[in-house]
Every structure is written in C-alpha cells, then in structure tokens.
C-alpha cells in the first residue's frame, strides 16, 4: 500500500468516498474472497461501488459490511480521517474528534470505542525474552492506607519486554481487580511465554511465580530505579490519559489500555500504525452501541 503515512499523503490517497471504499475493499479481501453465505470463492461485480457478489448464491457484500464502518452516521471519508487521527502518535479524545469532523459527541464517542475495540490484543503473540512486570494505579489521590490500597483507583498490571537491559520491546497492560496471586498469575501465564526471563519486584504476590516460570526472579525495586524502562512506560500511559483524555471510566478503562499498548507496540512498524489499524478494522465485526454500553453489574 504505502509506508508511514503523513497528513499530506493521507489527503492525496483518500480524496473522496470511492478512494476510501476501494482501499477498504483491497484490505478486506487481500487474502482472497469467500462468500459468507455459501463459501463460494468466485465473485462478480456487486451492486454498489467495490462490493462483491457471490457467483453462486448471488449474496452481495459491500466493503463496509462486517466492519466498524457498517451503517455509519457520517461519511466514510470522515471515518477514514478519524482512523488516521487515532493512528497518530497520541491519538485524540472523542470530544476533539466530534469538533474536527462536525459530528455529535455521542457519535464520536461510539466511533472511538469501535476503533479501540480493533486495537485490543489478539493474545496470539506472548511476550518473550526478558519481561519486567509491575502493578500500578491510575486516578486521583486517596487517603494513605497500610499495604496496597484497594480504594477507588483503577488497578493495572503492565508487562514489558526489555531488550539488552535498556530498550523496551512490546508491552501489555490490563486492569486487575486486586493484587492477589489468583488474579495476577493467570494473566501473566496467558501473556508471557513459558521460557521468558520474568523479573518482578519483591512484592509478596510474586514470591511463588518461579513455580510457573523457571527463569522468574525478584529484585529490589530501589524506588523504581531497577525497573526504570518499565516505569517510564507506566508514566507515559498516565501522562497520555491525563493529557489527552483527562478521564476514563472504570467500565471502559481496558479499552484505553488497549489503545495505548497497540500504538506503543507498533511505533516502529514499516507501514505505520494506520496500516496496522486498517488491517484489524477490515477483519473484525464491530459491536453495537448497546453492546458497548452494556456495563457489567
């Protein structure tokens, strides 16, 4: 397609709705066409621009069907612009997006959630090599309490590959309900390769981690200096939440963590974050507004 995309490239590449639909069609069927209804591999030109019609059952599928662009309340050109803006270094708030695209706050909020949904980790690529792990909290100040406070702050666990002892590789971050072994250990086991060299601080929760990871070890935090690279990523996350989004509720907190990790993990990609994000968008079916706002009790 093209390498890292800047604003001028974007404007030249996506001039109108047809150029967006053509690109989306190429992304959606880049690995070949298969009819969703009957499995036929042969297609003809569909009813609408860049849609495909099954040669067997005549099922007609548009490029936007089964993607976050399905039944949009605004033009696909605006939607592409929104994806491009969210693929930039820091992204933007839904409030800013609503002003930039001249759409309602509710519509911008929903579109942001759909993009974040596409940014969620696939879970197919465990962290490898040396992996540093630490827990942290986000939110406003609360009264000093003994031990690890379980107040209203949002609790999180970050895991990061550390290359040659100083460079951060891929990261993964998830919200946690508490700091108990039975909560944290399964998350680490799902996210980190078994042969990884897991390094944590001396918090008691991690004292049995060696039973799960043979190369696991604990070291003194020394006020964070022993995990400087990991803590820098945590500070970057906190700064991004405060500076761009100002506030995120408990129910959608994981979506913001996913967005931060997605962007961080693709910072050096040859084709840029926009290409990676569009690849995801073209292959997943988005949730409805009702599904995205269905909070757990």
What do the PLM-derived regions correspond to, one by one?
Residues 1-297:
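Residue-level recognition of single "structural anchor" positions
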């Amino acid at each position: 397609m093209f390498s890292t995309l800047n604003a001028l490239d974007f404007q030249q590449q996506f001039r109108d709705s047809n150029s967006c639909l053509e690109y989306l069609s190429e992304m959606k069927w880049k690995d070949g066409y298969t009819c969703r209804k009957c499995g036929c591999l042969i297609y003809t030109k569909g009813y609408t621009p860049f849609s495909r019609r099954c040669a067997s059952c005549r099922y007609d599928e548009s490029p936007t069907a089964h993607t976050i662009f399905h039944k949009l309340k605004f033009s696909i050109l605006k939607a592409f612009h929104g994806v491009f803006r969210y693929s930039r270094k820091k992204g933007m708030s839904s409030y800013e997006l609503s002003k930039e695209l001249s759409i309602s706050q509710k519509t911008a909020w929903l579109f942001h959630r759909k993009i974040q949904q596409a940014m969620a980790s696939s879970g197919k690529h465990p962290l490898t090599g040396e992996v540093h792990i630490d827990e942290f909290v986000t939110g406003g100040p609360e009264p000093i309490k003994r031990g690890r406070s379980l107040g209203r702050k949002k609790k999180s666990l970050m895991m990061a590959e550390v290359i040659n002892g100083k460079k951060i590789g891929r990261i993964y971050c998830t919200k946690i309900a508490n700091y108990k072994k039975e909560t944290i250990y399964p998350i680490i086991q799902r996210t980190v390769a078994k042969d990884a060299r897991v390094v944590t601080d001396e918090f008691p929760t991690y004292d049995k981690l060696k039973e799960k990871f043979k190369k696991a070890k604990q070291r003194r935090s020394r006020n964070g200096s022993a995990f400087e690279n990991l803590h820098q990523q945590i500070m970057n996350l906190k700064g991004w939440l405060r500076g761009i989004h100002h506030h995120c509720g408990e129910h959608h907190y994981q979506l913001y963590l996913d967005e931060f990790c997605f962007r961080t993990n693709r910072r050096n990609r040859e084709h840029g974050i926009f290409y990676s994000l569009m690849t995801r968008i073209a292959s997943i079916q988005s949730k409805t507004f009702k599904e995205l706002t269905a909070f757990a009790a």
